Amino acid sequence: MLKIKKLTVQYGPLPAINEISLEIKHGEIISLLGPNGAGKTTLLLTLSGILKTTEGRIIFEGEDITNLSPHQIVSRGIGHVPQGRHIFPTLSVIDNLMMGAYLHRNEKKEIKKELDSIYQLLPILKERIHQRAGTLSGGEQQMLSIGRAMMGHPKLLMLDEPSLGLAPRLMDEVFATFREMNQKGLTLFIVEQEILLSLSISERGYLLRNGRLIKEGSASTLMESRELITSLGEYPPY
């Protein structure tokens, strides 16, 4: 589905990511792990078209999408839930969701279909449809951010630190939603500091350090990996 070939991104004196190669297959949940500053967010921003590559190629479903614009990336079927959610707090839930439907803004039937699908998956959003987004709880705001990305009807959804700022109970709810999304056919690429939580729903994972890929393997292999423990110091509590 997605192949990254020797990707380098540099926007300072040193590469933020350096000759990274990885692959994501249809229907997988993949974790991208590493300490702060490893290059995880940079990789997602590059895949989203927000940052430009210095070298390397990005292939999605057989098409070279290297350095396409963000809206072109979305139109190909890649969604991105950024770190920090970035919702519009003064707008209602439905208005925030509609922000994600700009590619289908003239297709009312398609928009209704997507909304119905999102309300089925995330029923709390339907209950809060006219509520201002800024008054939602942290977990509800995360669900809204996910729902907005889903309005673009992605085939691959990338999530950057989805557990950030959430209580453990809410983390479990959010990650249970990810499992359900995956069971419905969506491929997920998750950047997450809650290592055990992320690996618990993933088939495979990749470990970055200082912009380089240093380890890849099954979730069970990574859980026992000396490289993972060394990179992060210790497993985060969960």
Show where each model-derived region lies.
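ABC-type ATPase nucleotide-binding domains, specifically the catalytic core motifs of the NBD
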Residues: 12, 30, 93-111, 121-123, ...
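Helix-to-loop junction immediately C-terminal to a conserved catalytic motif
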Residues: 48
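The feature captures the beta-strand-to-loop junction immediately N-terminal to the Walker
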Residues: 33-35
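ABC ATPase C-loop
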Residues: 149-150
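Conserved ABC ATPase signature
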Residues: 132-136
